[in-house]
A protein has these predicted regions:
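His/Asp/Glu-enriched, well-ordered alpha-helical/loop segment
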Residues: 1-78
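Active-site microenvironment of metallo-dependent hydrolases
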Residues: 49-132
Length: 132
């Protein structure tokens, strides 16, 4: 990654002898890479997010992927404020969009709290971005 290579992460197996703990979730793959690779810097964590999103499409030579005008509009909206939170929290997928059409939705995850003098709920998501 530091050398400028287009690195991609993925997994081919789900709940089989090769990967009995694999879920098929690329955010789990990125989460494992952060831990196993000791990639704990903010830029390194962002690079792990790219390694499960943009980079695989680039490595496969797929066109029409990304957030540019004219792309396929295939995306997942996460309950996270940034890529670092997406990997840290492995959040709810609020919307799955394919070719511009919502094909799956989930309600936001909220934890209810019963603590006197404190908020009644939390999403464990930052409301503001930390300084760089």
């Amino acid at each position: 990654m530091a050398a400028g290579l287009n690195v991609s992460f993925g997994q081919d197996s789900v709940m089989d002898p090769v990967g009995p703990m694999n879920t098929g979730d690329v955010l789990d793959v990125a989460h494992m890479a952060v831990h196993a690779g000791h990639l704990s810097g903010r830029d390194e964590i962002r690079a792990c997010f790219q390694a499960v999103t943009e980079n695989p499409a680039r490595n496969l030579g797929l066109e029409g992927y990304g957030l540019d005008v004219g792309c396929n509009a295939d995306l997942v909206v996460l309950q996270a404020s940034d890529p670092i939170e997406a990997i840290r929290l492995r959040p709810t997928r609020l919307h799955v969009i394919r070719r511009g059409k919502v094909i799956a939705e989930s309600p936001p995850h909220t934890a209810k709290l019963d603590l006197p003098g404190r908020p009644a709920s939390t999403e464990f998501v930052r409301s503001t971005q930390p300084p760089e």
